[in-house]
Amino acid sequence: MNLRDKLRGLLVRLYARRVEGHLDHAQVPKHIGVIMDGNRRWAKAAGSTTVHGHRAGAEKIEEFLGWCSETDVEVVTLWLLSTDNFDRPQDELGPLLGIIEDVVRTLAADGRWRVHHVGTPDLLPSGMQTTLKEAEEATAHVDGILVNVAIGYGGRQEIADAVRSMIVDAHDKGTSMQDLAESVTVDLIGRHLYTGDQPDPDLVIRTSGEQRLSGFMLWQTAHSEYYFCEVFWPAFRKVDFLRALRDYAARHRRYGG
């Protein structure tokens, strides 16, 4: 690292410290959703492989959760694998699934996070299903950030699964379709989502400069604030995170009003 890079790094750290010092923790979002985009483009820009990009993105996760802990965030939803990602070439998908499984094991072993899977388990390899179940059981009583790992997740699929779950539940209770139809409410559907009774995201961060949601938590983000960051996920820094929090705190949330 040359002198210019060292000075730039020092200035960024000083700036981050200043932003953090002015941050009102009472205005910090309690639930943050993250669309961790840009692993492949980061790798290409670095002249490296796609797999290396995914590994670099995975290594950023614990660091990010540490920043969330420092600022009193209570719930984080990390979109690790979408239902659309299963269409990727096998030579990329296979290693990516292995990296994601390692992430889940690492989060569970850390002891600071409570891991919860959101997504369709049946889409995942049996080994990953087992890893997710073990991680949830091992961290069920951890008093720390609730980390939703969105793996095999799609927003439309979540709503379809919620409706299916609602119908199955009604059938098991002997409820007629007529009675079910009359009892359907927004709250009832919400309770059957992957996130259940969790609070909806206050803030959704998407990295890489893309300004679209791609189906992320379609139901839960009706009143969420969005922050689009130009930085690729593996290069996401604490100062970028703090800027997102500062931007969120400066907004006036209308909740549809």
Feature names for model-found ranges:
Residues 1-257:
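Flexible, compositionally biased loop and terminal segments
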